[in-house]
Amino acid sequence: MTDRMTDPVADPVADANRAGAPPIDVVIYHNPDCGTSRNTLAMIRNAGIEPHVVEYLKTPPSRAMVAQLAARSGAGLRGLLREAGTPYAALGLGDPALTDDALLDAIAAHPILLNRPLVVTPKGVRLCRPSETVLDLLPVQGGAFAKEDGAPVVDADGRRVAGV
């Protein structure tokens, strides 16, 4: 057994994923129409984890949850805003004078403004763009993985492909 006090590289997520260990809680704020989100979800499942999937356009997170996700991700609210295909410009959300409350109001009224996929694991919270970002939050993958477009991400031994 690894001593977490003396082994700085101990990986609690990988440890928990081993046979006989309790399941890992993973949440993905997901849009099934988004290829990046679908690839991220597939990588989570490739690690042997069935996450709690929140289709955030159908079931938007509360204002408090969005604020917490932004803080825990380190990206801040502006870092979680999606511009393309949203009312971002029409609402003037690029204005740096807007407060966090104003941004939260906009996200609550228009959940499409929340960028995706957001993933929560015991290792942290990340906006997984590109989708490979999720690998930093997961234990070793269960085998090879390629994105929908065929781009390899993980090799047959469950390791990230060089350059990814």
Where are the language model's segments positioned?
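Thiol/selenol-based redox catalytic cores and closely related redox-interacting motifs
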Residues: 56-164
